[in-house]
Amino acid sequence: MISNAIARRYAKALVQLGAEEDAVDRFGAELGQFAALLEGNADIDSVLKSPAYRIEAKREILKDVLAKLSLSGTVSNFLQVLLDRGRISFLPQIAHSYAAFADELSGVIRPVLTSAFPLEDAQVESMKGALVKATGKKVQLSVQVEPSLIGGVITKIGDKVFDGSVRTQLNRIQDILQKG
């Protein structure tokens, strides 16, 4: 939990800098680019995160990587601060929190709609329209198919779940019948 609080604090600071520079999307892309590079290159990742290497060596490696990626000065400085403070290992969580703060700033929600069967485009658009109307925000809807639902849909927005599946309704009926 402490790591999430740390990640959120750093992410919020970078989003605020991005808002001041009108570069929230660009900073998010650059942060994601660097996080993907670390994820795809275990050698660089382990050197930057390992306490066995001197900070000067880590700074040189980071400097070389940043030069090749051509990241903005703000994001480069941000990554150097993370390295200097021993927080570079929090980068995946920071990138995730950054995306959430950026969405909040731009009024975007990313609900996940799960249905028992593939939905037609008109049905998806109808659900999207209902979510826009209910939340007053831009909606980036993700649709999944889960046959075990039997029927109906489950909509997840952040940490809220709206379960209208047949499976859940049958489970409720079963609970009522068992309790007598």
Curated annotation (Swiss-Prot):
InterPro entries, A to Z: ATP_synth_OSCP/delta_N_sf, ATPase_OSCP/dsu
Entry keyword Glycoprotein: no
Transmembrane segment boundaries: none
Keywords: ATP synthesis, Cell inner membrane, Cell membrane, CF(1), Hydrogen ion transport, Ion transport, Membrane, Transport
Superkingdom as given in the UniProt entry: Bacteria
Subcellular location, record wording: Cell inner membrane
Pfam families in alphabetical order: OSCP
GO CC, alphabetical: plasma membrane; proton-transporting ATP synthase complex
GO MF annotation: an example: proton-transporting ATP synthase activity, rotational mechanism
Membrane topology value: Peripheral membrane protein
Record's subunit section: F-type ATPases have 2 components, F(1) - the catalytic core - and F(0) - the membrane proton channel. F(1) has five subunits: alpha(3), beta(3), gamma(1), delta(1), epsilon(1). F(0) has three main subunits: a(1), b(2) and c(10-14). The alpha and beta chains form an alternating ring which encloses part of the gamma chain. F(1) is attached to F(0) by a central stalk formed by the gamma and epsilon chains, while a peripheral stalk is formed by the delta and b chains.
Family in the record: Belongs to the ATPase delta chain family.
Its job: F(1)F(0) ATP synthase produces ATP from ADP in the presence of a proton or sodium gradient. F-type ATPases consist of two structural domains, F(1) containing the extramembraneous catalytic core and F(0) containing the membrane proton channel, linked together by a central stalk and a peripheral stalk. During catalysis, ATP synthesis in the catalytic domain of F(1) is coupled via a rotary mechanism of the central stalk subunits to proton translocation.
Protein's recorded name: ATP synthase subunit delta
